[in-house]
């Protein structure tokens, strides 16, 4: 969690930062898709915020929210370039780091209404950093274009152009639909049980014909393929093989929110083995995408199941 000094009720500088921390975390995470990099960015936001208030001649900040969001967005943009360089040498498919409810990153209060789905976060990876910033601020958090222009130090016209390009790009790759939450959770649970239990009949029932499996092991965790696997028969075969390869002692399956999605968490010997999220077809009756994160570096914040 972002380091801040011990909290005192009279410390208005700390209070004002903490009062906006959830918003800052959610904005930066949706821009980066990395919990670790988000925490690093928020640490630098706090350092800049506190350093400003240590100056004896500092002018008061009238709009702390706007001021902090601007710092946070600029920190995220700086880290975006570094992350892109890391991803160039990443082993296999890169997926966003799972942000789960009740994890160890102090993100329990992240504004879930604005948490983007795993599928949308994957699409946002194809935008330019500025397009992604504009899309996140406007579409997820409702910032007006003039306000975004001030945050990014761009003209309102330039921001509107970025917004149009980003929206067109996203909607071409991910048609806008949001499955009913209870249905999404039920399908996720049925799929997880079938996948780990080797239930071929249920897998074939749940998977859409053109389903795609995305697995992120980062060269460190189990990954069935370094590339996406396409097609119902191929994806079902993968999970049948996974079920046969599970440890004899079995695994512990739990369900938690993963950013904006219901998710399945797989534990072995008390340690996280995988986080799985499924995306449904627009009709909501089949699975169009399966996202599985097994890279242990991306699972460090996930708490083990209670005994």
Regions found by a protein language model. Give the residues of each.
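Helical hydrophobic small-molecule/effector-binding pocket
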Residues: 196-207
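Hydrophobic pocket/interface hotspot
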Residues: 203-204, 211, 285
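Short beta-strand edge/turn micro-motifs at domain boundaries
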Residues: 275-302, 307
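Active-site-adjacent scaffolding segments
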Residues: 1-40, 44-193, 199
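A solvent-exposed, acidic/Ser-Thr-rich amphipathic alpha-helical stretch
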Residues: 209-253
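A short acidic/small-residue loop/turn micro-motif
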Residues: 55, 270, 294-297
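Flexible loop/N-cap segments at domain edges
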Residues: 237-254, 260, 266-267, 277-279, ...
């Amino acid at each position: 969690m972002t380091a801040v000094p011990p909290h005192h009720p009279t410390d208005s500088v700390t209070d004002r930062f903490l009062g906006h921390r959830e918003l800052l975390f959610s904005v930066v995470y949706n821009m980066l898709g990395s919990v670790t990099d988000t925490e690093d960015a928020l640490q630098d936001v706090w350092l800049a915020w506190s350093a400003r208030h240590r100056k004896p001649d500092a002018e008061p900040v009238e709009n702390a929210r706007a001021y902090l969001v601007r710092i946070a967005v600029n920190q995220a943009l700086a880290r975006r370039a570094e992350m892109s360089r890391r991803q160039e040498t990443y082993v296999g498919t890169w997926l966003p780091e799972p942000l789960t409810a009740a994890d160890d990153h102090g993100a329990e209060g992240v504004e879930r209404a604005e948490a983007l789905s795993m599928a949308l976060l994957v699409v946002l990876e194809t935008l330019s950093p500025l397009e992604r910033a504009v899309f996140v601020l406007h579409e997820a958090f409702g910032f007006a274009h003039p306000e975004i222009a001030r945050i990014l130090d761009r003209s309102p016209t330039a921001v509107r152009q970025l917004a149009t390009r980003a929206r067109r790009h996203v909607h071409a790759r991910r048609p806008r639909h949001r499955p009913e939450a209870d249905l999404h959770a039920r399908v996720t649970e049925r799929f997880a049980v079938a996948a780990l239990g080797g239930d071929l009949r249920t897998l074939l029932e749940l998977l859409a014909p053109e389903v795609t499996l995305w697995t992120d092991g980062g060269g460190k965790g189990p990954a069935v393929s370094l590339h996406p696997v396409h097609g119902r028969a191929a994806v079902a075969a993968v999970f049948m093989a996974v079920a046969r390869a599970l440890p004899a002692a079995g695994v512990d399956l739990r369900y938690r929110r993963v950013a904006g999605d219901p998710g399945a968490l797989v534990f072995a010997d008390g340690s996280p083995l995988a986080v799985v999220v499924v995306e449904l077809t627009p009709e909501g009756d089949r699975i169009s995408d399966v996202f599985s994160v097994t890279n242990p570096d991306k699972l460090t914040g996930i708490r083990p199941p209670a005994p």
